Amino acid sequence: MKLLILTCLVAVALARPKHPINHRGLSPEVPNENLLRFVVAPFPEVFRKENINELSKDIGSESTEDQAMEDAKQMKAGSSSSSEEIVPNSAEQKYIQKEDVPSERYLGYLEQLLRLKKYNVPQLEIVPKSAEEQLHSMKEGNPAHQKQPMIAVNQELAYFYPQLFRQFYQLDAYPSGAWYYLPLGTQYTDAPSFSDIPNPIGSENSGKTTMPLW
């Protein structure tokens, strides 16, 4: 709108005659008052250089604002696309960490198996040595063994894992119960007969004993 007004004013200024018009019947020596007013009238303020510069600055600022808005929109679109790309990468990293690092529950089960193996339970002889070595290394805080995945150990323990815990799940609550599972090499002795049990021998003054009062 400002640009249109500026062009109209410039066109009007260019269309104005440079020299006063000589009317018929008037001598050049006696100018008309209206012509003098027209010639002597000051140049309109609208056509000054300062106003023209201000109008040009306003038009330039509007164009720069439009460009800034477009640049901001492009930046937002680029940031949203980059954030969408970053999200799946973080999810993949979490999934990889879950596969590599063993869970606390798994380590607890493994500790139970190794502890029960000390009681010479025959069913626990199938525990692989790799599981024992890995558990000891993780307890000592060796980072080389902690970074190794537990997939191989899980495959070794998969075939006997549920059956052992169904049979020995009570041993964790009652540690003394492990002593009831005797090793295979033990020999069972027969119980003594009633004839071998000696009769109790009492003193003669047993009937005269008095109990102290507390």
Curated annotation (Swiss-Prot):
Tissue specificity: Mammary gland specific. Secreted in milk.
Annotated segments matching region Disordered: 59-91
Modified residues (Phosphoserine): S61, S63, S79, S80, S81, S82, S83, S90, S130
Keyword Signal: yes
Keywords, alphabetical: Calcium, Milk protein, Phosphoprotein, Secreted, Signal
InterPro entries per record: Alpha-s1_casein (IPR026999), Casein (IPR001588), Casein_CS (IPR031305)
Variant or mutagenesis effect after changing R115K: In variants E and C
Origin: domain of life: Eukaryota
Compartment(s): Secreted
Listed GO biological process terms: response to 11-deoxycorticosterone; response to dehydroepiandrosterone; response to estradiol; response to progesterone
Annotated signal sequence range: 1-15
Keyword Methyltransferase attributed: no
GO cellular component term, pick one: extracellular space
Documented effect of changing T210A: In variants E and C
One Pfam family it belongs to: Casein
Family: Belongs to the alpha-casein family.
Its biological purpose: Important role in the capacity of milk to transport calcium phosphate.
Note: The sequence shown is variant form B.
Record's protein name: Alpha-S1-casein
